[in-house]
């Protein structure tokens, strides 16, 4: 039975990656051994996890938790929280670190905003994170659909809404005007890593374009908190990390997340290095000294992990294990 499951999982991963070209992975003979601190705690009672999954399936919705193989899925689902992924489950880009399906996406589901709102109401949650696949096939990159989702959710629910958006191909003026119709409480766009590695890690993205999106949104909608995140372990240097944090802060970002990159499968980019806990603590100290209100740094930290906690509670200590 286990062998059959392994085969099915392998086939699913290969199907996701059949268009992605990742160089030199076949030449990697040894995989880095995971250190002791890279351990995922599985809850004993999984009934809540299946309840969330069934609610998503029932309404034909997606969670980035599942699609991106997030290590925190069990904990978050067990606590009744999920990060919803709109605009389908197929991404138009082929970032080799990401487990989300890549290819030609389906047409936008105009019923999704209302289904999303109804599901959030049924789940009874008070903080919502919405993200999406990259939709370079759409003129506005999906911005109008984000707005429609925000409207639908707020019409039925008294919740705070955080959106984690793509770069919209740099159509910043268009995007800013569209979001004037409905604003989130937090605007998040992940920078992911250092500019030197962008071509390898984020083909199709541009470091300065991402910074400009964050800066422009903050200038136009100053009441909305702006947020960004990095994943480490792909070959970046300490001095580069510090410079990225300074660039983000200069662009108006006040909330920061920094986590460890974990290879979704053998077909994705390999981990170059596992960051020790002490280094995450140092990164957090540096971020707070730069001026960030909140800096959440640790191996399992993700942009939407404990997002409601991140959004309103300034953290001025270095205990990453309290998160």
From Swiss-Prot:
SUPFAM superfamilies: Radical SAM enzymes (SSF102114)
Main location: cytoplasm
Note on cofactor: Binds 2 [4Fe-4S] clusters per subunit. One cluster is coordinated with 3 cysteines and an exchangeable S-adenosyl-L-methionine.
Subcellular location: Cytoplasm
GO cellular component, one term: cytoplasm
Positions of the Radical SAM core domain: 77-293
Family: Belongs to the radical SAM superfamily. Lipoyl synthase family.
Name of this protein: Lipoyl synthase
The species this protein was found in: Buchnera aphidicola subsp. Acyrthosiphon pisum (strain APS) (Acyrthosiphon pisum symbiotic bacterium)
Gene designation per UniProt: lipA
